[in-house]
């Protein structure tokens, strides 16, 4: 759905043509709408293509580069809330991809490590992830990719600086 079709629907629903045009027809609104659309579909398509969610793959990748790490340190590195990390790790553990144990010196700390099966999953996911990214960025030139990276980084910085 484009901004224009969204505007039409809002005009029909609200009967407020002037407000809708001012609020939803701006270039900024179209950018926000497109970003939200990409955000909605990218996770679903990524998981369908790779067989694993981006969050779980990120956790496995971090563990791939660490021998063993505390669950709280892992949570800080991925910037996902602790309950979500726990859920992800429980599912990964049930699939044999990670193992968790209590730290002997401090039973409050849970240590996490990648299993051999998890290591194999990371290695097999690399090709799937590369294929997904290649298809996602088809018809986007190298120059456009560099520009997109720059623009998104600046937008992320701007968003982080917004006072709530």
From Swiss-Prot:
It comes from the Bacteria. Keywords: DNA-binding, Transcription, Transcription regulation. InterPro entries: ArsR-like_HTH, HTH_ArsR_DNA-bd_dom, HTH_MarR-typ, WH-like_DNA-bd_sf, WH_DNA-bd_sf. Transmembrane segments: none annotated. One of its GO terms (molecular function) is DNA-binding transcription factor activity. Gene3D superfamilies: Winged helix-like DNA-binding domain superfamily/Winged helix DNA-binding domain. Coiled coil: none annotated. Residues 28-157 form the HTH marR-type domain. SUPFAM superfamilies: Winged helix' DNA-binding domain (SSF46785). Residues 71-94 bind DNA. This is Uncharacterized HTH-type transcriptional regulator YdgJ. It comes from Bacillus subtilis (strain 168). The gene is ydgJ.
